[in-house]
């Protein structure tokens, strides 16, 4: 028999791995930099130079680039900075991966500690979590009918499928120039820079994927005057960039765009008068784009014939259904108190933050997320001998992102029924978090109020395992066994019975049972009595 099939495109993770590594190294202060007295701030970035697949493994080669802001022992230019890097290479075992496979790598700096060994040497210690995965686009064929059925009895089921329209990785770039206001002096050297994205939003439209939001730029620099004083400048510029995506022209699409900075560089260049007053921002964003569309289809679930024996050949297929796409916000208001040993605050320069998602748990109401917000302050002190100070604090947060279908299912089903349902239909969740807003307000010289809004984007899929007909075997009827069956049967319905299963078992059709019992509906209740008349096609004897 020739089957009618449609193609189902989906994305899956073929293999994944993660590994925690520790980098520990000493770094000598360059000769052109003054001696170190105290480390004020440190920052690290991961750069992957090579990601290579091998048989059953992935090789990562990259660098930890670190920056340090510190106090020096000089009378003029008390604040200085340095930049260095530590290379690393790591092998992650990934079952099933072959050479030339495309591997995606990401990393997270879980801890970065930089200490002073002596005035010309520092120790750098970092704990890094490396992750690799191999995403693949999968294609299945779903059976939706038979071309020439020859009078077969067929049962269909209506279902929604999630059709993958696009899966791609891309980059978008933005270059902006900012001229210092006239009240600010020229730049001799940038000592510290903070570049953070706020209120990030992604939209899918006719022109593709558009990113919007804000880039918060904070710069600590040394002015060109003879005093070598330190200046601070802060501004916000709009983020507006995007990439093309053909799937954006489809109607009723569902999309997920994961955007994260690949690199953010800030340099200074001369203006038209030759003065160092123009800041140049070059921003590169990595985009992980997936686009789906829900489609309602009628799948062929079962088939039999009164003329011959038909044996469907089935294989298991996983269907995905969108359960919820939810954007939630967690608001934090905390108070930071400086230690007694720290310098008092005169003015806050910048407030930087990073958010880490530590655990997610699927509950009866939705997904419970727990994580931490790491907040770092850079401020001007009341002590002219030590003009710049810093403070750091960690705040935990917890948020419940509701899944409406999950709540309704809990209220509708008994616990044992819910457990059975969850075994059959598993919920797959993807949760991303980011800082939407972060601010620091000085209360007094020792206390700062921290306010933050953490964005949590949840995409939940309901997974359903089904049997999909891939082929059919045809055999002649066993007429001897068929003749031994009674021609007339009285049947009392049991739990789980359906007219389809009864008709197939007793060699008749659902329509004949309805007609013989003067019924119009196919719903059976336990204890109902029905009359079954065996039906034998003449062609069966002739064959």
Language model features with spans:
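Interfacial loop/beta elements and low-complexity acidic/Ser/Thr-rich segments
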Residues: 1-484
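Intrinsically disordered, low-complexity Ser/Thr-rich linker and spacer segments
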Residues: 475-488, 534-543
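Extracellular LysM carbohydrate-binding repeats and other cell-envelope/extracellular binding modules
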Residues: 508-543
């Amino acid at each position: 028999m020739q089957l009618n099939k449609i193609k189902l495109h989906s994305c899956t993770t073929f293999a994944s791995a993660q590994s925690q590594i520790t980098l520990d190294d000493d770094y000598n202060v360059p000769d052109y930099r003054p001696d170190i007295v105290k480390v004020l701030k440190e920052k690290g970035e991961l750069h992957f130079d090579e990601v290579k697949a091998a048989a059953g493994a992935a090789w990562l080669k990259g660098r930890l680039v670190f920056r340090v802001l510190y106090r020096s022992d000089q009378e003029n230019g008390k604040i200085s900075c340095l930049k260095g890097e530590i290379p690393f290479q790591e092998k992650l075992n990934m079952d099933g991966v072959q050479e030339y496979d495309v591997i995606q790598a990401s990393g997270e700096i879980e801890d970065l500690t930089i200490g002073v060994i002596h005035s010309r040497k520092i120790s750098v210690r970092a704990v890094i979590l490396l992750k690799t995965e191999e995403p693949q686009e999968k294609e299945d064929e779903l059976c939706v009918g038979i071309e020439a059925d020859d009078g077969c009895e067929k049962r269909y089921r209506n279902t929604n499928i999630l059709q993958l329209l696009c899966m791609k990785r891309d980059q978008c770039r933005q270059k902006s120039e900012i001229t210092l206001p006239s009240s600010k002096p020229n730049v001799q050297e940038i000592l510290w820079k903070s570049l953070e994205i706020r209120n990030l939003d992604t939209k899918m439209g006719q022109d593709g994927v558009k990113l919007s939001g804000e880039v918060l730029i904070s710069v600590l620099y040394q002015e060109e005057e003879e005093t070598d004083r330190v200046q601070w400048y802060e501004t916000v510029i709009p983020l507006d960039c995007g990439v093309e995506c053909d799937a954006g022209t489809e109607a009723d699409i569902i999309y997920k765009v994961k955007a994260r900075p690949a690199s953010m560089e800030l340099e200074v260049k001369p203006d038209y008068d030759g003065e160092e007053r123009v800041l140049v921002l070059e921003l590169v964003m990595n985009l992980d784009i997936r686009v789906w569309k829900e489609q309602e289809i009628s799948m062929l679930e079962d088939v039999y014939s009164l003329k011959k024996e038909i044996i469907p050949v089935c294989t298991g297929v996983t269907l995905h259904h969108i359960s919820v796409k939810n954007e939630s916000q967690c608001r934090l208001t905390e108070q930071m108190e400086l230690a007694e040993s720290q310098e008092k605050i005169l003015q806050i320069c910048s407030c930087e933050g990073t958010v880490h998602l530590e655990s997610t748990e699927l509950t009866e109401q939705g997904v419970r997320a727990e994580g931490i917000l790491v907040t770092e302050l850079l401020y001007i002190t009341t002590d002219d001998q030590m003009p710049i100070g810093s403070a750091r604090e960690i705040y935990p947060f917890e948020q419940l992102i509701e899944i409406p279908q999950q709540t309704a299912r809990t209220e509708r089903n008994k616990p044992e029924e819910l457990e059975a349902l969850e075994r059959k239909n598993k919920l797959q969740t993807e949760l991303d978090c980011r800082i939407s807003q972060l601010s620091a307000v000085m209360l007094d010289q020792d206390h700062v109020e921290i306010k933050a809004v953490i964005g949590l984007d949840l995409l939940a899929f309901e997974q359903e395992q089904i049997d999909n007909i891939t082929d059919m075997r045809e055999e002649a009827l066993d007429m001897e066994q068929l003749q031994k069956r009674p021609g007339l049967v009285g049947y009392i319905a049991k739990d789980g019975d359906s007219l389809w299963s009864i008709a197939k078992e007793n060699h008749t059709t659902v329509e004949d049972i309805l007609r013989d019992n003067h019924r119009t509906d196919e719903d059976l209740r336990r204890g109902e009595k029905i009359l079954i008349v065996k039906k034998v096609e003449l062609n069966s004897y002739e064959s």
